[in-house]
Amino acid sequence: MSSRSRGAGALVALVALFTAGYLAPYLLPTVVGRLSAGLGLTPAQAGLVGSVLLLGSSSAGFALAARGERIGPRRAARAGLLAMLVGYGSAAATGTVPLVVAGAVLGGLGSGTATAVAAAGIAGRPDPHRASALGLLSVSATAGALYLTLPHLGGGHAPPLLAIACAAALVWPVTGRLPGGTRARARTNAMTGPLPYRRAGAVLAGGILCWSLAQNALWGVSGRIGLTQAGLSEVTVGAVFAVALGAGLAGVTAAGALGSRLGRAGPIGAGTVVIAGCVLLSSAAGDLLSFATGEILWNAVYPVVLSYLLGLAASLDPRGRWAVLVGSASSLGVACGPVTGSLLSEGVGYPGMGTVLCALLLLVAAPMTAVARHVSGRPLVPGSIRRRGGAPAAVLAGTASATPSLVPQVGAPEQPVAPIRIPAVAGRRRLAKSMFGLAGVRGRG
């Protein structure tokens, strides 16, 4: 098999794994709503179960940040998919709340493992931003189809959990295209070194934690806003979510086509401000028009900004360590979102919750944009490789005509320049530095 075929197969496996791992957060509103209706839980209790599920997901990501390469991508991916299958399947099969919670935690650990493996693999791709966009495109399409299908599969808490378990089973066969443990260990030994961009990475991780928390606090109660405050039926709410995720598909497609042409700072900063406005609109929705407008516009912009954030994290370290850590911080924010949204909505109502979340988003927009401006270097140009030490050679003054896809970007490994010793030639004068110019030897002995 050619190297191009192997690379395409690995990309397919990573996108499929990303889809399975991210499916639980995308289905969070219907999972929380059905836990509340099917098991007789209060909104806060159902939100807490959703938070516990996603907390397990983020914990797995943090645990694998330093050990994933030693285990091997294929083995770690299969372990995560097996945990998803057993955890979500067992939670769907029982109506006992403690067993449902235990199954959700196990399934969340599996989702986090799958997402961490996919994030590390995407960070090692030649164009991590477009690989992230493909993953978001796939998970948005899958979740949109499920939002149209699940209302017709009966009530209870089981259908969405079974859907996630089935996704894990369907992805299992393509994990054979991922590298095994031996190759992963060889890659780990070949690429060692301290974690780069520590300050920028820490700011980005903290910012994306709050960014994800704010949005998933609303996402976790969006179903209840549509059902209770806007007075819509479950079928109508599901249709709105499906259309919203369809708008997300269009947004991710556009982001993938644009790539890094717009930079990262602009889409991250401006996109977060737009999202903050959508959060205000959705939380105050009282009818179908305002609810649908807020949700559709929000879901169209959210995956675009997320793809740039994930691409930024991947560019910080070619080994994928920052990609996994930032992704896990995002999962931690997602995990805290449902219970935060439930507590805020019960305390100050949905509009008050939206105001608080909007303010939080505006606060974190500035530091994340600053990180994007600071570390998103311009393309490498000829003659600018540093001879020894320091930051990667990609942090250089670029030209507008440089082709980004053909030159290293920020985070790429530095290309070492080795000195070459020229031995003295017998019977001739010893070579001296003054004998050489830009075009070669200027004199002869």
Question: What is the predicted function of each stretch?
Answer:
Residues 18, 316-358:
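A late C-terminal transmembrane helix in Major Facilitator Superfamily
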Residues 75-90, 266-281, 355-358:
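Structural signature of the two symmetry-related core transmembrane helices
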Residues 59-75, 123, 250-264, 345:
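Helix-to-loop junctions at the C-terminal end of transmembrane segments
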Residues 97, 125-180:
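Helix-loop-helix hairpin linking two adjacent transmembrane segments in secondary transporters
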Residues 103-138:
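Cytoplasmic helix-loop-helix junction between adjacent transmembrane helices
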Residues 262-309:
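C-terminal transmembrane helical hairpin of 12-TM major facilitator-type secondary transporters
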Residues 112-126, 303-318:
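Intracellular juxtamembrane helix-capping segments at the cytosolic ends
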Residues 29-45, 220-236, 282, 311:
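Short amphipathic helix-loop junctions that connect adjacent transmembrane helices
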